[in-house]
Amino acid sequence: MAKAEENLRDKCRWSLGGMTALVTGGSKGLGEAVVEELAMLGARVHTCARNETQLQECVREWQAKGFEVTTSVCDVSSRDQREKLMENVASIFQGKLNILVNNAGTGITKPTTEYTAQDYSFLMATNLDSAFHLSQLAHPLLKASGSGSIVLMSSTAGVVHINVGSIYGATKGAMNQLAKNLACEWARDNIRVNSVCPWFIATPLYLNDEELKKEVERKTPMGRVGNANEVSSLVAFLCFPAASYITGQTICVDGGFTVNCFSFKPVL
């Protein structure tokens, strides 16, 4: 009996069965990959996006795969909509939430001198304000679950300079620091907080830009761009009971880019 119980505990360390999760921006890209990863591992997932049509298309695919996913329309740059989202999540999951993945985000690439006040406000609201406010709103639900995990989807632009815009980099750097602060403050509530920082990930936009492709491959020791499921797997790991002593960390998923000192890949 003792051996059977030990085996069950070991199995549960690598499962999200019975857990609840909220993933913002889950209708495409990294967010969609995260939703599918968590659901595949047994979690009940709620996700949101601005585009209802895209959400419904995803729902049909998820239902066909047997995933338990609910959805709602939400623009995370809106404080009122964030509050309505969390009220909805609290109702669906009976006041308890195990996992929050603040994934929704956006970017505007311009020289710093060309940014407008509207650009600044929009990027801050979508990337940083939403991550802070949703974490704040989710705190009582995460605490009530007895074991909570927050993952902030940041970027390597929050760790090193990348030519994608100073405001975007500032929001992502702030998210990394937010994860550290919340990890320390909320550890007593058994809530862990980490940030994940992807480098360029394969998307149609990226794949159609040959110059960008060449530059990324030159600067990445592994010589290739990453795939969405190589990021979602880390997000899932950070939510496993097996990761119960990992908190306050900023983890790059970048094929070695951030430790490459911006060196171009040599021709051998």
Swiss-Prot record:
**InterPro entries (alphabetical):** NAD(P)-bd_dom_sf, Sc_DH/Rdtase_CS, SDR_fam, TR
Q: List the EC numbers from the record.
A: 1.1.1.-
- Catalytic machinery residues: 168 (proton acceptor)
Which molecular function GO terms apply here? oxidoreductase activity
> Is Oxidoreductase among this UniProt entry's keywords?
yes
Can you tell me which residues the record assigns to a coiled coil? none
- Going by the record, the broad EC class of this enzyme is oxidoreductase
Q: Which family does it belong to?
A: Belongs to the short-chain dehydrogenases/reductases (SDR) family. SDR65C subfamily.
State the name under which the record lists this protein: Tropinone reductase homolog At2g29170
